[in-house]
Amino acid sequence: MVSMRIPAGVAAAAVAFLLFGAVPAAAACFESGVGCTNSGYMPYPALRRLSCDALWTVRNTIYSENGYCFKTARGLATFDNSSCSYDDLGMVPLNAYERENVGRIVKVERQKGCR
């Protein structure tokens, strides 16, 4: 068996590529039954099937879509800060679906022991 290490940025991009479905101007939609970030509640069973990396990508896509300015190396490698507006996560304006979806993702990340 051959083993390869894939850089985190490449892995995150691959996860995003595999998960993204059609992407409207203001929201990402994910395949695998997860749904769109801002127009419906993401089902727990679909979220539980995702890896920790995929959960991180989906959660942070919601923040990116709404103008969060990423500061970590992983965030900067994955998302474009060119049109960001908010340095504080608490100030990022989320609609009710987005707020609930972030909460659901965080809950599943905790259940799975994601970091």
What are these regions, as identified by a protein language model?
Residues 70-115:
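Compact alpha-helical subdomains of small soluble proteins
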Residues 27-48:
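Short N-terminal segments immediately surrounding and downstream of signal-peptide cleavage
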Residues 47-85:
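Amphipathic alpha-helical packing elements
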Residues 1-12, 17:
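Bacterial N-terminal signal peptides that target proteins for export
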Residues 16-25:
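C-terminal segment of classical bacterial N-terminal signal peptides
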